[in-house]
Amino acid sequence: MESEMLQSPLLGLGEEDEADLTDWNLPLAFMKKRHCEKIEGSKSLAQSWRMKDRMKTVSVALVLCLNVGVDPPDVVKTTPCARLECWIDPLSMGPQKALETIGANLQKQYENWQPRARYKQSLDPTVDEVKKLCTSLRRNAKEERVLFHYNGHGVPRPTVNGEVWVFNKNYTQYIPLSIYDLQTWMGSPSIFVYDCSNAGLIVKSFKQFALQREQELEVAAINPNHPLAQMPLPPSMKNCIQLAACEATELLPMIPDLPADLFTSCLTTPIKIALRWFCMQKCVSLVPGVTLDLIEKIPGRLNDRRTPLGELNWIFTAITDTIAWNVLPRDLFQKLFRQDLLVASLFRNFLLAERIMRSYNCTPVSSPRLPPTYMHAMWQAWDLAVDICLSQLPTIIEEGTAFRHSPFFAEQLTAFQVWLTMGVENRNPPEQLPIVLQVLLSQVHRLRALDLLGRFLDLGPWAVSLALSVGIFPYVLKLLQSSARELRPLLVFIWAKILAVDSSCQADLVKDNGHKYFLSVLADPYMPAEHRTMTAFILAVIVNSYHTGQEACLQGNLIAICLEQLNDPHPLLRQWVAICLGRIWQNFDSARWCGVRDSAHEKLYSLLSDPIPEVRCAAVFALGTFVGNSAERTDHSTTIDHNVAMMLAQLVSDGSPMVRKELVVALSHLVVQYESNFCTVALQFIEEEKNYALPSPATTEGGSLTPVRDSPCTPRLRSVSSYGNIRAVATARSLNKSLQNLSLTEESGGAVAFSPGNLSTSSSASSTLGSPENEEHILSFETIDKMRRASSYSSLNSLIGVSFNSVYTQIWRVLLHLAADPYPEVSDVAMKVLNSIAYKATVNARPQRVLDTSSLTQSAPASPTNKGVHIHQAGGSPPASSTSSSSLTNDVAKQPVSRDLPSGRPGTTGPAGAQYTPHSHQFPRTRKMFDKGPEQTADDADDAAGHKSFISATVQTGFCDWSARYFAQPVMKIPEEHDLESQIRKEREWRFLRNSRVRRQAQQVIQKGITRLDDQIFLNRNPGVPSVVKFHPFTPCIAVADKDSICFWDWEKGEKLDYFHNGNPRYTRVTAMEYLNGQDCSLLLTATDDGAIRVWKNFADLEKNPEMVTAWQGLSDMLPTTRGAGMVVDWEQETGLLMSSGDVRIVRIWDTDREMKVQDIPTGADSCVTSLSCDSHRSLIVAGLGDGSIRVYDRRMALSECRVMTYREHTAWVVKASLQKRPDGHIVSVSVNGDVRIFDPRMPESVNVLQIVKGLTALDIHPQADLIACGSVNQFTAIYNSSGELINNIKYYDGFMGQRVGAISCLAFHPHWPHLAVGSNDYYISVYSVEKRVR
């Protein structure tokens, strides 16, 4: 028993090795990013890193009140005492000379940090001299910053009244100088440095006076009679910065080994004072022999990093920058450390001042106030760097040995690398990021730093934002001037990451000629494709909606470089090269003609059939912008436009909705260019549409829609959220609004009546008569669909490329097909384009006859209009005659019908004139279905000036921006599905173990033998008549389709899990369903008899709403009929191929990975295909047909030879033809006459014939258990074994007092369990199994 328990978890991986490994190896369909994400760009980054108000300190006032030789009365100095001022002993020379020398030295010290500023000294000044100095500097500085340095060592301490001291002319008195006056003279922006005792008092007084000014300004603004109201506004003090040597109650330190102006020394000569202070801390030195005299002999220059002194200065800068970035709030760091070079230097040095002066019980003060930094751990790294440097001094000076560079930067990069390697999610940013920035321009560390920076940026947009905020941008911009080839991949990667997050850097790149760097990289054939892809992306950003960038890259030969790489094997490179081309000639005619000369459009044609949907989409985008220029055109350009349009038209049947949506946008550019031609075509189609009949909803005499009631109950349709939402029908109120807006009257003066074929609302788009604010249309879905079906799809295919003059007609047909697209986002956009032209054509039509077909197609190609389509809503009533040539007049009043309105849905009827309006999908599931609809938000204004062109604004996709998101996301990180510890991976393992258990347990039941299959384990009333039923292979979920909705049931618990509308038009029905990815993340595919295929996810999920993953027109020539086979499909999970057929003469094979049609196999018969079955291992397809024939196709062979066998033994409609999925598997087929025939595909005749009940309506064959179940019109289900022996009949429901089952409408076996689901015309769905004791 113990051994069994130990082995039981392994059973799923041991006994059924092949099946379980298959689960892991099976490809997943429709699970790529384009299916799982909304096709839109990322939210743009708020540019907090870019300094909008970068400043310079242009003027410096150096005010020294020293009065050398005379001590102020309120200061008692120690003996000995600190005497040095600017490293000068004032008593070593005469007082006046000392004062001048100190002033000159202070200026030199400041000039080290800002050599270009204008310096003015004021030595022992009077109040008037200070005023004159300050007002002069402010006047010259204008809006730039001015620095005021005040040394008050020779005057009394500041007063609590807000005064500092200066002198009278004769130096006989100390004269107070009000900080209020100083504020007035200095203005803003300014920075003040106070080096005196009690300096914190000045900071407090400054703030009080600043607040007082603000209050005075507020009073003056309220009261115009206030004296201040008549005066010029005093400057605001908000942009003023203050640095003070100590708190309000503190005195400056007087230790004789320190300079008297310790604060000034820290701010202006930080390395010198830091080294002296370090030597005074006896406990920290590694080498006791280093003296203050030795420090003065450190070789090198501060600005030369290769020397000991320069390296120390570099390390100091990196450490103080790092401390500030890690401690300060981001906005304060930006303001103090990145806005102004001199301010940044002073604040870096202020951090040192805080560290040194606090050790002498003195606390420097700043405004804005900084958090304490003197205990930060990075100071220990500084101490170590100083110690390592000083330890070498004796040997360097005495023996002349070479200086060994500090390991500081290498060690900090290692720490950064450890953070990248060993860190966890949701961590604090790495402390070393500012140090990485410091070493980018160092040749020694550059390569490693760039590599680590790239790895950091790859963590995501947050990392890019951090790097930009620390100031990385100017460094990586400067590096583009480097010619080192080894830097190319790293710089390309870093710039791709930056531009993916903040595309505004395009201007900086072009300004600094950075685009030339990337042009040379893209043109480099030795550069790996991945890096050329990133380069193509970078260049695509540079030229995106930026004319200067377009011109610069055009001159750099970008078009030719891109064209050379259109057929590169790397799909992402093909995609971005195409996007790059599309962007460079977007609204830039010079680039377009350069493309014409290089035959760019013809070279792009090959990408329209690319196996990767994103590449096809990029090619469509590029060709769309190619024809979308609004410059003057010639006959030559018109011919090119027509050729491009006809090539694009072939993509109308592309399997990817992303491609088709981009196609609509591309064609809309053509519509804009040739507006008048399309208006003419639109009028003709509208006129012709009246001649075609279309099944229309029943109407009462009052004109209200009468929905058919399928059921006595009104089930609640579940909310459907999708990238293409199933949209609500517009309400009667919005319809009335559209009638009022048009105010159309016939010439007789009577009101115009509307029909669904003429003016109607539609849920398929969101523009009101060409205005995007409302949901009303000239053309309803039904009108468009009638036009589309009247000009049949096959005729479209035959027309492509036939006549130069019929291009507009053909493109209009293409747009009609796209407006009826099964994917709502595609149809929405196409409806906008069609309605914009229809509105313009009908409202602006003159009272003249519409051109007939011959005159239209024979006319010469008209020149395009010079401007885009400008759709204006009717301002008041148009002329009465304006509708005489359109179909906007009709005698029969009908309510408009939505394309998504389920005709067979249970519903209610409203009062006459009201519209049947399911709003349920727009609200949470708890909302009542027929509650008040969504509020209309349309603007009712009739002012025509308020309506504007909208095609270019609203008819667009987010494809390019969505594609750019790839570069913003981590590319080095292991995908979550491959990470053994990720939640996704663990969920997959659990699902595969569950699958193994289901297969094993089901097989055990089947092996026991099946003697009866009539134990009813589930019975429930479905909301609609079941038409297709499908078991999920591994969960207790069953999908039941009625005409146009899907219901999901848990057959174990007997609960309804979900119910939602499939979205197919009301005259169509669901005829087939398949579970995709059933072994993992299941999707449901539905096929309708108009040839449309839809794929859903999140069904039967209580936490999420169903979403449409994709949809496409699987078969194009099908016309829905009540007696046809509809659409039949068969799904191959192993290959990702979908076989489709039905009321057509072909079997069409779709590759769901490529989202392309890969093969059309002609059936060779005149009847419909009723059943499909395939075997991926043998590449065989078996089709059962309506004429009774069974046809076998080998899809590896040429189309003319691929039909390898035809069996004509059945004489009636084939209900089911099944190809057994094993190497020697037979074909089992059944006709409505009940004859079961078994064929060996290698033999020309059947190998066995069985006879079962006649009059079959539904049939299924169990893939594992050799069971055949058939449903009859005579209200019973019969189950047979493979020998044709009847196992049992099912005629009555359990628990209903023997109620008879209805006529069987559908049935299906479970793929593994011996379970049978049966749907009948009385709405009931039931599941039967073997006896309980066997289960």
Curated annotation (Swiss-Prot):
One of its GO terms (molecular function) is small GTPase binding. Changing residue 597 to E: In alphax3 mutant; abolished interaction with GTP-bound RRAGA and recruitment to lysosomes. Changing residue 560 to F: In alphax3 mutant; abolished interaction with GTP-bound RRAGA and recruitment to lysosomes. The modification Phosphothreonine is found at residues 706, 865. Keywords: Acetylation, Cytoplasm, Glycoprotein, Host-virus interaction, Isopeptide bond, Lysosome, Membrane, Phosphoprotein, Repeat, Ubl conjugation, WD repeat. Insulin-stimulated phosphorylation at Ser-863 by MTOR and MAPK8 regulates mTORC1 activity. Phosphorylated at Ser-863 by NLK in response to stress, disrupting the interaction with small GTPases Rag (RagA/RRAGA, RagB/RRAGB, RagC/RRAGC and/or RagD/RRAGD), thereby preventing lysosome recruitment and activation of the mTORC1 complex. Osmotic stress also induces phosphorylation at Ser-696, Thr-706 and Ser-863 by MAPK8. Ser-863 phosphorylation is required for phosphorylation at Ser-855 and Ser-859. There is a cross-link at residues 932, 948 (Glycyl lysine isopeptide (Lys-Gly) (interchain with G-Cter in ubiquitin)). Part of the mechanistic target of rapamycin complex 1 (mTORC1) which contains MTOR, MLST8 and RPTOR. mTORC1 associates with AKT1S1/PRAS40, which inhibits its activity. mTORC1 associates with DEPTOR, which regulates its activity. mTORC1 binds to and is inhibited by FKBP12-rapamycin. Forms a complex with MTOR under both leucine-rich and -poor conditions. Interacts with (via TOS motifs) EIF4EBP1 and RPS6KB1; interaction is independent of its association with MTOR. (Microbial infection) Interacts with vaccinia virus protein F17; this interaction dysregulates mTOR. This is Regulatory-associated protein of mTOR.
